[in-house]
Design a protein with these regions (language model features):
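Short, flexible turn/loop "capping" segments at secondary-structure junctions
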Residues: 1-4, 43-45
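Short glycine-/aliphatic-rich beta-strand segments at the starts of folded cytosolic domains
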Residues: 2-14
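Short amphipathic alpha-helical segments
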Residues: 12-38
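An amphipathic, aromatic/His-enriched active-site/gating alpha helix that lines ligand/cofactor pockets
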Residues: 30-38, 55-91
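A short beta-turn/loop motif at secondary-structure boundaries
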Residues: 34, 41-46
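Hydrophobic residues embedded in beta-strands of well-ordered beta-sheets
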Residues: 49-50
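Short, charged, intrinsically disordered terminal tails
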Residues: 92-102
Length: 102
């Protein structure tokens, strides 16, 4: 199975950028290596957050995390509007706050 890259984006609620920045700089609430990922990164713009998952089953890993880590999902629901959506890439102007590589 080839390495997969799965990128999701979520729109920040007004006034939540600083809180999101602190969360992202702290890194993920899980161990990417234990999940079989080969890369994981977080990016931020003025109004959106981007999460990048890389590995053999990146998409299914990201979806499983969303289902299993409900406390973390609930915390992010206070910072973002609506549901995250898959996007093709992180925009060039986004600032990388976290980057892990195996």
């Amino acid at each position: 199975m080839a390495t997969e890259r799965y990128v999701v984006a979520a729109r920040l609620k007004p006034g939540k950028r600083a809180e999101a920045e602190r969360e992202l700089e702290a890194g993920p609430p899980f161990d990417p290596a234990e999940l079989g990922l080969t890369g994981h990164a977080a990016y931020l713009t003025d109004d959106e957050v981007y999460l990048v998952f890389e590995g053999k089953a990146a998409r299914s890993t990201a979806l499983r995390l969303a289902q299993e880590r409900l406390t973390d999902v609930a915390r992010w629901q206070g910072m973002v509007s609506g549901l995250p959506a898959r996007v093709a890439e992180v925009p060039p102007g986004a600032r990388r706050l976290y980057d892990w590589r195996r």
